């Protein structure tokens, strides 16, 4: 069972309250449907594409974040530092590692590195984590939709190359029901100094 909700509205400070409502609401629904003796909390996965990256020569396959990307990474840390995140995953590239580093530093959590071409390995690790955990994932414009689909969410198109402001909250209930909420955060305008060619 999959339910897909798509909110295209942009949030700044209120988004933290909205995220809290989503997380608490998912927990309440799971507790209500569980038996009195065995209440199982849902698992929540927060996914983003890496932040904006620098324009680099074609031979450089691993660019750093641009100034706009660094700003977005700091915004992620501010938004999610109080969200009860238990684990952080990012691919091996600098742009994904740098996207989650401010958040990892604030929470004093390690960044679990996963191969970009092995999304199935990440999906297995997420499924193996205990119920009730909130997990943060930074991926790429092609891998984020792939991970969402593999976890039981809807089939989504590849994220447009110029979009870095999509935020996905996937909730997996104890009965296997999946709910996806899509939000926008931060700046929506491509900034100078970012690459427009690689995912």
Residue spans for each PLM region:
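Short beta-strand segments
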Residues: 138-140
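Acidic/histidine-rich alpha-helical segments that form the ligand environment
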Residues: 133-135
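Active-site-proximal alpha-helix that buttresses catalytic centers in soluble enzyme cores
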Residues: 34-131, 144-158, 163-173, 177-199
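Bacterial N-terminal signal peptides
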Residues: 17-28
């Amino acid at each position: 069972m999959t339910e897909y909700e798509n909110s295209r509205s942009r949030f700044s400070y209120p988004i933290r309250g909205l995220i809290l409502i989503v997380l608490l609401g998912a927990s309440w629904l799971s507790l209500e449907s569980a038996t009195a003796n065995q209440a199982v909390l849902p698992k929540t996965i927060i996914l983003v594409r890496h932040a904006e990256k620098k324009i680099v020569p074609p031979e450089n396959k691993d660019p750093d974040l641009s100034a706009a990307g660094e700003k977005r990474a700091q915004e992620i840390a501010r938004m999610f530092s109080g969200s009860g995140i238990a684990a952080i995953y990012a691919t091996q590239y600098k742009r994904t590692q740098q996207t989650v580093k401010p958040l990892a530093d604030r929470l004093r959590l390690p960044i679990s590195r996963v191969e970009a071409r092995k999304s199935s390995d990440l999906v297995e690790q997420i499924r193996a984590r205990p119920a009730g955990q909130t997990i943060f994932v930074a991926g790429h414009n092609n891998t984020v939709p792939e991970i969402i689909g593999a976890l039981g969410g809807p089939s989504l198109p590849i994220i447009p190359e110029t979009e870095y402001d999509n935020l996905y909250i996937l909730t997996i209930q104890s009965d296997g029901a999946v709910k996806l909420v899509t939000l926008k955060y931060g700046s929506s305008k491509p900034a100078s100094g970012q690459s427009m060619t690689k995912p």
